[in-house]
Amino acid sequence: MAIRLEDKKAIVAEVNETAGAALSVVLADYRGVTSGDMTALRAKARAENVRLKVVRNNLAKIAIRGTEFECIDPALVGPTILAFSMEDPGAAARLLKDFAKEKEAFEIKGLAVGGELMGAEQIDRLATLPTLHEALTKLAIVTQAPVTKLARTLNDIPGRITRVVAAVRDQKQDAA
């Protein structure tokens, strides 16, 4: 069924806006996946703030012009779903990687971050990135450790002085 020109322009504008705000994109071939499974995937994507787009390849190629995701142009072949991560760069990668494990027909084609197209084998690289919350927690732990050590050292100084004074006192008492 043909799409009207106005509808095509709206689709291109929507995908362009999404691509402009996204941190990463993952491309996958969705052939053989049922509509029920796709609906479940979309629900999970909404929860993770990942935007899924299924558009014609020609419209997608036009939509990504002028964005950092122009590099995905060669991968736009055959039925393709685009998963844009809006807050966490690894969210779309984790989501589609888990979905691909469940559904053998679902095949990841590639991913792009920072204007670089990577193959599907690189999905783990992006999927294992910590979330913002996890990264901040690790940073807090790493920065807290030296401060805690310093506090313990400073708290230990009066105790050491007391022990030295007591030892000197004991020596003088033994000598007397």
Swiss-Prot record:
Disulfide bonds: none annotated. One of its GO terms (cellular component) is ribosome. The keyword rRNA processing does not apply. It holds the Pfam family Ribosomal_L10. InterPro entries: Ribosomal_uL10, Ribosomal_uL10-like_sf, Ribosomal_uL10_bac, Ribosomal_uL10_bac_type. Keywords: Ribonucleoprotein, Ribosomal protein, RNA-binding, rRNA-binding. One of its GO terms (molecular function) is large ribosomal subunit rRNA binding. One of its GO terms (biological process) is translation. Forms part of the ribosomal stalk, playing a central role in the interaction of the ribosome with GTP-bound translation factors. NCBIfam families: PRK00099.1-1. Belongs to the universal ribosomal protein uL10 family. Part of the ribosomal stalk of the 50S ribosomal subunit. The N-terminus interacts with L11 and the large rRNA to form the base of the stalk. The C-terminus forms an elongated spine to which L12 dimers bind in a sequential fashion forming a multimeric L10(L12)X complex. HAMAP family: Ribosomal_uL10. This is Large ribosomal subunit protein uL10. It comes from Marinobacter nauticus (strain ATCC 700491 / DSM 11845 / VT8) (Marinobacter aquaeolei).
